[in-house]
Amino acid sequence: MGTPCHYALFDLQPSFRLDLDKLATRYRELAREVHPDRFADASEREQRIALEKSAALNDAYQTLRSAPRRARYLLAISGHEVPQEVTVHDPDFLLQQMQWREELEELQDEADLDGVGVFKKRLKFAQDTLNEDFAACWDAPGERDKAERLMRRMQFLDKLAQEVRQLEERLDD
């Protein structure tokens, strides 16, 4: 038995643009149906199947709710498998990465919580813009190479956003 498509689990068509609130609602509905606790009195086989379904559902949800993971998944199911670690060959974006990292280091060194908040808003805007660019690119035939480049940028910004959240938590303590 193969793993069903993440979109199929949620009765969705593969698309980058998703209503994340509806996705979360559907996830909660499905999670209740397959939760292993509901199968406590079932056979060992049924318990194992419930556990597998629950794990597959959780994985699908985590993938679809994350823009970079969703982009990577769409590329993969369309036959454009992308290796996890590939060097980005975009000088402008590499320069932007270095500038963001330097700015984040300065904010950390200065323990500037307000500055981190401003940085976080700019980063969110950059992520939203990149998500829109990917969505438009995804909807255009013949743009898979560009979509892959955009997905890599999305992954970087997502990682940077995680680092910003961690810094914010450290400075807020």
UniProtKB/Swiss-Prot annotation:
Gene3D superfamilies: DnaJ domain, HscB, C-terminal domain. GO terms for cellular component: iron-sulfur cluster transfer complex. This is Co-chaperone protein HscB homolog. InterPro entries: DnaJ_domain, HscB, HscB_C_sf, HscB_oligo_C, J_dom_sf. PROSITE patterns: DNAJ_2. It comes from Pseudomonas putida (strain GB-1). Belongs to the HscB family. One of its GO terms (molecular function) is ATPase activator activity.
